[in-house]
């Protein structure tokens, strides 16, 4: 039975209560307050829903992750990065990145990044929890991604690309930055061919929960200064 959250409690049900069909649906309801969002990620779940639906909270099994030491960069991508065609920065325009991620795409109907979702993550950015990666070409924003940094874990949320491999360049730059700062895992949530080509793979929900327990409260040395 699906658990419905109330606004006066930040408690989520145990992850093993998540449904098998649809895979990983853990709870519904609640709100997108900064406190609830932080608690959700610490617990091992994330919000994902369409406009007109209640807020839905997910903890899929298996979970797609990338370990920084297992990042795979193809020869063609490495060559592109050496060419210096794109300029990559962190936290210089979080609102523009999340707006671009929310924009309609040719292969999808609608967007799950609602206005309420955008406002919630912009607040997390103001609090120093959510971060963005900007990829520019000749000063124009052509790619990027955003997510949350907590302890030694980074929770990726969404990425976009308006130029060839721009989001891959941003992602590889981010992973290298996180590895050097002591991060041990990037949560990619759901599988895609794009992420698998970069070295992402699936782990069980139980193994993901083990990473949370061991690394959420450990320090990192990441600098996000623009």
Swiss-Prot record:
Compartment(s) where it occurs, according to its Swiss-Prot or TrEMBL record: Cytoplasm
Annotated keywords: Acyltransferase, Cytoplasm, Transferase
Reaction it catalyzes: N-terminal L-lysyl-[protein] + L-leucyl-tRNA(Leu) = N-terminal L-leucyl-L-lysyl-[protein] + tRNA(Leu) + H(+); N-terminal L-arginyl-[protein] + L-leucyl-tRNA(Leu) = N-terminal L-leucyl-L-arginyl-[protein] + tRNA(Leu) + H(+); L-phenylalanyl-tRNA(Phe) + an N-terminal L-alpha-aminoacyl-[protein] = an N-terminal L-phenylalanyl-L-alpha-aminoacyl-[protein] + tRNA(Phe)
Enzyme class of the recorded protein, top EC level: transferase
GO MF, any single term: leucyl-tRNA--protein transferase activity
Cited Gene3D superfamilies: Leucyl/phenylalanyl-tRNA-protein transferase, C-terminal domain, Leucyl/phenylalanyl-tRNA-protein transferase, N-terminal domain
Recorded family membership: Belongs to the L/F-transferase family.
Primary role: Functions in the N-end rule pathway of protein degradation where it conjugates Leu, Phe and, less efficiently, Met from aminoacyl-tRNAs to the N-termini of proteins containing an N-terminal arginine or lysine.
UniProt name for this protein: Leucyl/phenylalanyl-tRNA--protein transferase
């Amino acid at each position: 039975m699906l658990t419905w959250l109330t606004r006066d409690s930040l408690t989520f049900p145990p992850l093993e209560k998540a449904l098998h069909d649809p895979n990983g649906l853990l709870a519904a309801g609640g709100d997108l307050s900064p406190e609830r969002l932080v608690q959700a990620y610490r617990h091992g779940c994330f919000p994902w829903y369409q406009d007109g639906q209640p807020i839905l909270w997910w903890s899929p099994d298996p979970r797609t992750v990338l370990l920084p030491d297992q990042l795979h960069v193809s020869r063609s991508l490495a060559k592109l990065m050496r060419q210096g065609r794109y300029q990559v920065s962190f936290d210089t325009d979080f609102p523009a990145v999340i707006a671009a991620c929310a924009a309609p795409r040719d292969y999808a109907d609608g967007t799950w990044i609602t206005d309420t979702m955008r406002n919630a993550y912009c607040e997390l950015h103001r609090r120093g929890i959510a971060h963005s990666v900007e990829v520019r070409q000749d000063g124009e924003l052509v790619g990027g991604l955003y997510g949350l940094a907590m302890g030694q874990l980074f929770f990726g949320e969404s990425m976009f690309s308006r130029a060839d491999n721009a989001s891959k360049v941003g992602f590889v730059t981010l992973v290298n930055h996180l590895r050097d700062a002591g991060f041990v895992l990037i949560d990619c949530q759901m599988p895609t061919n794009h992420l698998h080509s970069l070295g992402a793979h699936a782990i069980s929900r139980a193994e993901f929960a083990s990473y949370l327990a061991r690394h959420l409260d450990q320090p990192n040395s990441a600098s996000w200064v623009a």
